Amino acid sequence: MARGGAACKSDARLLLGRDALRPAPALLAPAVLLGAALGLGLGLWLGCRAGRQRTRHQKDDTQNLLKNLESNAQTPSETGSPSRRRKREVQMSKDKEAVDECEPPSNSNITAFALKAKVIYPINQKFRPLADGSSNPSLHENLKQAVLPHQPVEASPSSSLGSLSQGEKDDCSSSSSVHSATSDDRFLSRTFLRVNAFPEVLACESVDVDLCIYSLHLKDLLHLDTALRQEKHMMFIQIFKMCLLDLLPKKKSDDELYQKILSKQEKDLEELEKGLQVKLSNTEMSGAGDSEYITLADVEKKEREYSEQLIDNMEAFWKQMANIQHFLVDQFKCSSSKARQLMMTLTERMIAAEGLLCDSQELQALDALERTMGRAHMAKVIEFLKLQVQEETRCRLAAISHGLELLAGEGKLSGRQKEELLTQQHKAFWQEAERFSREFVQRGKDLVTASLAHQVEGTAKLTLAQEEEQRSFLAEAQPTADPEKFLEAFHEVLERQRLMQCDLEEEENVRATEAVVALCQELYFSTVDTFQKFVDALFLQTLPGMTGLPPEECDYLRQEVQENAAWQLGKSNRFRRQQWKLFQELLEQDQQVWMEECALSSVLQTHLREDHEGTIRGVLGRLGGLTEESTRCVLQGHDLLLRSALRRLALRGNALATLTQMRLSGKKHLLQELREQRALEQGSSQCLDEHQWQLLRALEARVLEEASRLEEEAQQTRLQLQQRLLAEAQEVGQLLQQHMECAIGQALLVHARNAATKSRAKDRDDFKRTLMEAAVESVYVTSAGVSRLVQAYYQQIGRIMEDHEERKLQHLKTLQGERMENYKLRKKQELSNPSSGSRTAGGAHETSQAVHQRMLSQQKRFLAQFPVHQQMRLHAQQQQAGVMDLLEAQLETQLQEAEQNFISELAALARVPLAESKLLPAKRGLLEKPLRTKRKKPLPQERGDLGVPNNEDLASGDQTSGSLSSKRLSQQESEAGDSGNSKKMLKRRSNL
């Protein structure tokens, strides 16, 4: 049958079919009956679909939750590795050529409703309407579509313009709420396949592609954070080595002391990383456990737990750095000035390292986004290729049906024979399509398994080579010559190694995709050959024997059927090109959204940085009194912690942006399907009547409405997740504030100690000089007398310290006993209070309301225990602090009395005149009174420097008081030593 180029080609073909029926009036009555039966069957089928569409429009959010995402992907970013971008562009061009060669069709002019509405029947569903609208119920025997566990079957958007009109009416009467709590709960419970590598997505039969790809993007961000954290630890060790060499220039790198200090830090970092990995593994295994599927709610929960654990790890690293100075002073007897200088150098170089890590994180996060876009592109190509067999099947069956209709219209084939032949062809074609699907899944999984094994092997070899490269670089490098260049060179080595690993993974993904494409093409051509055999057997063997037609006429009819199928495939190819164009537009829109997210993240980080820096500078400016060195040390520490915190928040912001796209993917996919359907309807025919034009306009209005809904949903979802990010930023800011309060407090404490030490040393030197001069000038001072005074003074100090230790231990035991009594009393009260709750529980069997009230009361009572417990601990801390202050004041008074007695006896021994002897203690008292006040106040801060005390641990109080006692004892020993010096002077005087 000849084909013209007219616009109304399909209508002309249908008229030809009706003309062919007119020469056989004897078959008019059977044809009318058959047409009525077919029309009734088609009407019932459309009624069922319209009912499903009404349900879909009434539950729009549920449908969005269950859509199979295919269009939420991004185009490759313009930033990143140029070589990688060129390779991806070449691969994308190859994939596009493959799609252009074998894009499947989508509709025919016979199956107007099923095919024009882009209804895609699953391969493993055998019961389908036949091409002419009839059906074969005998094939419907326990054959259903495979569905993901815990995921209901979803409906397509409106199946035709008519069903769209009905759906619009129903949708207008439904609720207009978009972002309700119920909608959120349903969407967060959406189930998709748990994947660990991209090749796993390619060979799966039923997957939510976009959610799987975005989950892989989240894994990439986590791997990036792990790599950067390990690099920071390695750079920290190298910087610490350089600082130790500067601090201990006489020590060699293989010195025992040097290695002991270094091994302590390395061991702490290993334990820190090991503990973090255990927590991350436990979080990964929680929730669904070993299940093959996962929900979006589980993903968001795990990402939140990951963020909390990473922040805790970051804070632990801060504490480890802060303890280095105390570690050097306490364990290795390093001077405070040298340790402080080492910390300043370490902080300054770590700031430079954080800057390098921040720049690297920004670039590699964009590179990870580029890889995600490439994965979406490759997944879309595979999706198109897998659909080509179904489109081939539909087009060939539609052409066969049309050819058999022509024979039936000419009276050469009865209706029963036509139905029997169509049923046989449908069964044979769809069974072959199912075989294609089964073989593709089976062989595809084998390809994926081999690809993953090859990737693991290659990664292991690359890791060993990179570790050897790191060792050789560190062995050859001279870090002390130019630390900045060394850090930059070391960072370049590590960054290049990370890029090599990413390139290896991407190359393996491309190789796996190419293998799957080749497999799909191979199976497709094999299936098409089988289809051709079915057609040849039908028209060259079955029809001649059944109808008695000459072989030439059957062969001519076969050629007509093939031409008709080719024409329909051409229409399908044009529609697929339109689909691909819409997909590219969607990628461009998503790319714009990602760029906006990056800009918003940059603005947020700038705001947080300016806010924190302004706060810390304002605090230091109002405090005053700190030296320039102390101020610079505090600002450096704040800058380092702030850089680390902002880098963590930036990565968390990327993860939340990914979760936003995952939440919106359902509505985006629905809107994309509506746009594709509009393009299909616009290109299906140029001759539309008024009713069809109205329905097309209704479809366009539906597209605009869904676009508006998507925009509103996107704004609300972004706002919700951005508020979560701001809350986490506030928590990190509080941690940063706590560390800076401690740092500023320590700086003020050091400043106060230095000022007090200088004043006290000056006054003590003046007083001792005066006393020594008086003793030397006295003729009554002898060696025996001075020795007797010193011995008595030592004995008195020993008794004072013993009494102080006993009183301190007794008071701490008393406080502990009181706390235990209070705890037991509170427990008794709690056990006696729930009597009313038990009575309420007695009625729990009667009404569910009583059970609910009981649960609420128990929850409130349980939550009320926390502030009570905190208040008790605070009260115990206050009591212990008060007792320790009292004991310290008593000890200080007793030591001062002993000192005054020694001075008085020494003055009496020297026969110093009474007026002078009274003047000296008075002067001493005037100097010590303000000094006592200065020494008395910083003592709780000194205890605070040791860490938060534990109420149940008496050793903390012993350590605090013990350190104080040792300080007092060393002070008195120094004074006694000065008295010994005066004794030596008297000996020299007597010898003279």
Swiss-Prot record:
Transmembrane segments: 26-48
Parts of the chain on the Extracellular side: 1-25
GO biological process, any: positive regulation of smoothened signaling pathway
Compositional bias per record (Polar residues), positions renumbered to this chain: 66-82, 957-982
Biased segments, Low complexity type: 156-166
Main location (coarse class): membrane
GO CC annotation, single: cilium
InterPro entries: Limbin/EVC (IPR026501)
Annotated function: Component of the EvC complex that positively regulates ciliary Hedgehog (Hh) signaling. Involved in endochondral growth and skeletal development.
Name by which UniProt lists this protein: EvC complex member EVC
Protein species of origin: Homo sapiens (Human)
